[in-house]
């Protein structure tokens, strides 16, 4: 199944795009590696949002950050059986030279879940 992410306005990000991807992936990996977290009872998306926001705040306090995670259960979906539709729109009033948005798709083949992550930054 092919899920496409169309990027927003990330050219003015407080971090390079590669660093944002690494930050998201490392946050997710640390959740999976933490034996004290029971992911069957804890919300993976809420924990991921918390970790990503904590790391972003350490990089720059000049911005306010917003993180959103949409979780898709992709178990049993394939090219012939892709029977779901998802639409998510977001709007903001911002200064285009300082503020922006970054979208990223994170797939976990072991749990059959896909996370669509959106990060927004607004200059203070």
Curated annotation (Swiss-Prot):
InterPro entries: Tctex-1-like_sf. Its main location: cytoplasm. The keyword Zinc does not apply. It is found in: Cytoplasm; Cell projection. The keyword Transferase does not apply. This is Topoisomerase I damage affected protein 2. Gene3D superfamilies: Tctex-1 (3.30.1140.40). Keywords: Cell projection, Cytoplasm. GO terms for cellular component: cell projection; cytoplasm. Belongs to the TDA2 family.
């Amino acid at each position: 199944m092919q899920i496409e992410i169309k990027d927003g306005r990330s050219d003015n990000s407080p971090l390079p795009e590669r660093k944002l991807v690494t930050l998201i992936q490392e946050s997710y990996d640390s959740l999976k590696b933490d034996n004290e977290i029971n992911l069957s009872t804890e919300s993976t998306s809420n924990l991921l949002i918390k970790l990503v926001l904590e790391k972003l705040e350490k990089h720059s306090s000049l911005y306010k950050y917003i993180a959103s995670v949409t979780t898709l259960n992709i178990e049993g979906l394939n090219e012939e059986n892709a029977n779901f539709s998802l639409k998510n729109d977001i709007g903001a009033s911002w200064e285009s030279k300082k503020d922006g948005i970054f979208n990223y798709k994170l797939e976990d083949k072991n749990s059959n879940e896909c996370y669509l992550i959106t990060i927004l930054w607004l200059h203070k």
